[in-house]
């Protein structure tokens, strides 16, 4: 009898696993209200309003006064960026910021693209919307939503946008011409922050889906890295029939399967689906994964637990804010940059570009609300939310940049995204792909579209 029960149980489990293993689940498309107070009975204003970035002499004067009060602490000898942002190099950065950086000029650059705001679920959502200046005969532009992460902003996409919207004038084929929409995550930059607890990536994905509908797009493509990769993933889980293609340059795919391959991959990598390049980027696993993630994730523990505490200090000090943000643009671009006195920052970025991104946090006072996004998404622990355990069933492309904080092998990506149709090992670049290597990322997005359209 017990043998029959055991065999029946095993058979039942096998049938359940076989039936459910490829079940294309979707997240429920709910509704929300994140503005202050209770939701009004009146219909929400769905108008789309032009917006312009502005500044003032008073704003700049206040910034300069605060910079002038910076209190310098000498770094330890030969510490480079191992202890965080090297304060000797910080002096150079703030001297440039105080005496040479032209915020009014950068505001003009920000306003080169059309900005808009619209109210969704009680929040004023900011976005830029860039249409192609010209189209080949018989072509229509492909709508592409691009989503930033932390501590970035919509400004990360300024150099890649013309490569996507006007490829012919930038030495590229006009086979794929895009209409690009770059929103600011609520609580970042010019998008209003939630007044209520619980505003996470799924809520953001739903709002951005509503934004695309409001702009008249029933079907569209989406692209993201960092938080943008999770938000875009959630969009594909919420409304897969509306997402024609998903392109990522980062993927949160840690699972029992990836853990197993990490533990056994150095010896049995080929049998576990790892390539020689995967093994090169992941091993020795103690240094390249475990020690590296421990060393670079301290900020995450703070922001997942008590974001308002550190945020209050950063929101009061522009120099502290710059050090906190720019240290990520050093190490996340290449972890080896921590061995350099200047963190390698100007090897990949200009100080004007870096400080413009910092100013988008400083002038809007959004560092605290941006950090709260960590607590809302990760504060309850890993793999505690439904979407983390769900697969994604839309055509997917992936760019694996070699200096991303954690390399993600194709086998891992395919486990989460079974319809992966394009996976590229990029020749250089790190976490801030669109900001650092716009040409490479644009080429891979176009490659993904070519593969998708051939199918």
Curated annotation (Swiss-Prot):
Positions bearing Dimethylated arginine: 295
Spans within the Cytoplasmic topological domain: 22-455
Catalytic activity: cis-stilbene oxide + H2O = (1R,2R)-hydrobenzoin; 1-(4-methoxyphenyl)-N-methyl-N-[(3-methyloxetan-3-yl)methyl]methanamine + H2O = 2-{[(4-methoxybenzyl)(methyl)amino]methyl}-2-methylpropane-1,3-diol; 8,9-epoxy-(5Z,11Z,14Z)-eicosatrienoate + H2O = 8,9-dihydroxy-(5Z,11Z,14Z)-eicosatrienoate; 11,12-epoxy-(5Z,8Z,14Z)-eicosatrienoate + H2O = 11,12-dihydroxy-(5Z,8Z,14Z)-eicosatrienoate
Variant or mutagenesis effect after changing residue 49 to C: In allele EPHX1*2
Segments passing through the bilayer: 1-21
Active site (catalytic residues): 226, 374, 431
EC id: 3.3.2.9
Source domain of life: Eukaryota
Membrane topology: Single-pass type III membrane protein
InterPro entries associated with the record: AB_hydrolase_1 (IPR000073), AB_hydrolase_fold (IPR029058), Epox_hydrolase-like (IPR000639), Epoxide_hydrolase (IPR016292)
A GO molecular-function annotation: oxysterol binding
UniProt keyword list: Aromatic hydrocarbons catabolism, Detoxification, Endoplasmic reticulum, Hydrolase, Lipid metabolism, Membrane, Methylation, Microsome, Transmembrane, Transmembrane helix
Subcellular location: Microsome membrane; Endoplasmic reticulum membrane
Top EC category: hydrolase
Keyword field contains DNA damage: no
GO cellular component: endoplasmic reticulum membrane
Family note: Belongs to the peptidase S33 family.
UniProt protein name: Epoxide hydrolase 1
Gene name of the record: EPHX1
């Amino acid at each position: 009898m017990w043998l029959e029960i055991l065999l029946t149980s095993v058979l039942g489990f096998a049938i359940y696993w076989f039936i459910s293993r490829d079940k294309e689940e979707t997240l429920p498309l709910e509704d929300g209200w994140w503005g202050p107070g209770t939701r009004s009975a009146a219909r929400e204003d769905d108008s789309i309003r032009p917006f312009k970035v502005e500044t003032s002499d008073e704003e700049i004067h206040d910034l300069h006064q605060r910079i002038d009060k910076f209190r310098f602490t000498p770094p330890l000898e030969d510490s480079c960026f191992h202890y965080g942002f090297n304060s000797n190099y910080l002096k150079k950065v703030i001297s440039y910021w105080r005496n040479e950086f032209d915020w009014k000029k950068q505001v003009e650059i920000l306003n080169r693209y059309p900005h808009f705001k619209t109210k969704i679920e009680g929040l004023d959502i900011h976005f830029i919307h860039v249409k192609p200046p010209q189209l080949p005969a018989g072509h229509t532009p492909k709508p592409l939503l691009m989503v930033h992460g932390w501590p970035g902003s919509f400004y990360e996409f300024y150099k890649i946008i013309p490569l996507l919207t006007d490829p012919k004038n930038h030495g590229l084929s006009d086979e794929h011409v895009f209409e690009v929409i770059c929103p600011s995550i609520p609580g970042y930059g010019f998008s209003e922050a939630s007044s209520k607890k619980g505003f996470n990536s799924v809520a953001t994905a739903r709002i951005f889906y509503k934004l695309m509908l409001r702009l008249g797009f029933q079907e569209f493509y989406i692209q993201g890295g960092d938080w943008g990769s999770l938000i875009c993933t959630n969009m594909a889980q919420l409304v897969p029939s509306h997402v024609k293609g998903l392109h990522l340059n980062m993927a949160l795919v840690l699972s029992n399967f990836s853990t197993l391959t990490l533990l056994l991959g150095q010896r049995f990598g080929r049998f576990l689906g790892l390539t020689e390049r995967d093994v090169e980027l992941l091993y020795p696993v103690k240094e390249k994964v475990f020690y590296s993630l421990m060393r670079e994730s301290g900020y995450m523990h703070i922001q997942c637990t008590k974001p308002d505490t550190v945020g209050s200090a950063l929101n009061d000090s522009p120099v502290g804010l710059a050090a906190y943000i720019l240290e990520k643009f050093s190490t996340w671009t290449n972890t080896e940059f921590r061995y350099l006195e200047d963190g390698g920052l100007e090897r990949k970025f200009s100080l004007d570009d870096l400080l413009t991104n910092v100013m988008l946090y400083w002038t809007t006072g959004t560092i605290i609300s941006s950090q709260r996004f960590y607590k809302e998404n990760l504060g309850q622990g890993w793999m505690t939310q439904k979407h983390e355990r769900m697969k994604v069933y839309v055509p997917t492309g992936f760019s694996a940049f070699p200096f991303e904080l954690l390399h993600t092998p194709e086998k891992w990506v395919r486990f989460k995204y079974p319809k992966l149709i394009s996976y590229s090992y990029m020749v250089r670049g790190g976490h801030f792909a669109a900001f650092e290597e716009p040409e490479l990322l644009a080429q891979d997005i176009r490659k993904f579209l070519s593969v998708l359209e051939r199918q």
